[in-house]
């Protein structure tokens, strides 16, 4: 992965806000601490609204995708700006220090982890359960402390590349359209579940989701209609 210079990242964000200020912002894998800090500076300076932070720290394979300096920059710079943070189970463990995947009561562990992560951000915390083997239920901890379990069945599909990225992007789209956080999360989860269930099979290895599954079924492209 070739890192982009932080000055260029910040300039690109400014160029977007100068032209068409976005109604929502999704932040995914940034990679390096300097770039993460540049994103945080630009979003804070611009007063960005509806910021969804997907802390892409640990891949499905278990490999670390960001170094410790980048994680610190994420926690100190981006999480305080987030309206929604969307860690998967491994990322929730890393951010909270709570063991989830080996816990006897996974749901209770997710709730403890969400509470700790909530101390790092003023926004909602969505602990994604898609990497669990039993089901794919997610925990949404809202900013007011309310906890909501969003139930989901595990979809047996080896082509699951980009599920977390798609989910966080769909949440941002819902917020941009004026949906509340819980409604945006529920609609985004339904969209991703449908994209997995569609069973698109492209190329070799873990392929992408079928982002156009609603269109193929004769419906609207939007997940929020």
Describe the role of every protein-language-model region.
Residues 93-94, 157-181:
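Short, small-residue alpha-helix embedded
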Residues 109-118, 148, 180-195:
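Short, well-structured alpha-helical segments that form the helix of a local strand-helix-strand
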Residues 34-44, 123, 143-147, 182-183:
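Nucleotide and nucleotide-moiety/phosphate-recognizing core
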Residues 1-65:
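Conserved N-terminal subdomain of the carbohydrate kinase-like
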Residues 182-225:
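Charged C-terminal helix
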């Amino acid at each position: 992965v070739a890192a982009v210079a932080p000055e260029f990242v910040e300039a690109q964000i400014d160029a977007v806000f100068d032209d068409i200020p976005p109604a929502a912002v999704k932040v995914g894998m940034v990679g390096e601490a300097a770039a993460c800090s540049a994103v945080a500076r630009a979003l804070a300076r611009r007063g960005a609204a509806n910021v969804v932070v997907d802390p892409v720290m640990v891949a499905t394979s278990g490999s670390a995708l960001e170094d410790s300096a980048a994680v610190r920059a994420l926690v100190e710079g981006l999480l305080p700006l987030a309206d929604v943070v969307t860690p998967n189970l491994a990322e929730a463990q890393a951010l909270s220090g709570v063991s989830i995947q080996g816990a006897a009561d996974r749901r209770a562990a997710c709730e403890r982890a969400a509470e700790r992560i909530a101390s790092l951000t003023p926004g909602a915390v969505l602990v994604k359960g898609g990497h669990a083997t039993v089901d794919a239920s997610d925990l949404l901890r809202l900013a007011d402390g309310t906890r909501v379990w969003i139930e989901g069945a595990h979809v047996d599909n080896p082509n699951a590349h980009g599920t977390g990225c798609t989910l966080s992007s769909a949440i941002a789209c819902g917020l941009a359209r004026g949906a509340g956080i819980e409604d945006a999360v529920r609609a985004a989860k339904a969209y991703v579940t449908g994209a997995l269930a569609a069973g698109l099979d492209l190329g070799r290895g873990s392929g992408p989701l079928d982002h156009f599954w609603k269109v193929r079924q004769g419906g609207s492209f939007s997940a929020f209609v």
